[in-house]
Amino acid sequence: MTKNARLVLVVEDDLSVRRPLVRFLEMHGFSVVTAETAEEGLEALRKHQLVAAVIDLRLKRGSGRDVVVSVPTEVPVIIFSGLPSESAELERVRPRTRLIEKPYSLVLLVETLEEMLAESAGSQNLHP
């Protein structure tokens, strides 16, 4: 299993969305592993020790939902979707999950990610 203190999984099938997102995350000190399909996302979860995941629910091959529910509960997940109703249930039932509606701001996404990671670090300090 690959270990990296700031490794984020990005599951997005649209290259025109994925490429700038990955670059922006890297500019902000993250390492990124990418997946275009749900199957690749699930494989990345098995191979890597992640600090967070950014997942598009609507993929051409497979469902981002399958990846979201497979992410360990201690790992923060940001879901992005053009249909907020489809992700509302995931936000309710899966801890450490937030929705960012498409179209979204890369700045907002990174701010949300940093906030979620700070919350995770705080809760780990309270419960070692």
What are these regions (language model features)?
Residues 80-81:
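Hydrophobic/aromatic residues positioned on beta-strands within the core alpha/beta folds
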Residues 22, 100, 104-117, 121-126:
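C-terminal output helix
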Residues 15-33:
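Two-component/phosphorelay signaling modules centered on CheY-like receiver
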Residues 15, 36-40, 107:
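Acidic phosphotransfer microenvironment of two-component signaling modules
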Residues 56-71, 84:
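Conserved phosphotransfer microenvironments
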Residues 64, 92-100:
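As written
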Residues 9, 34-52:
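Acidic, metal-coordinating helix/loop segments flanking the phosphotransfer/catalytic sites
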Residues 12:
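Conserved acidic carboxylate
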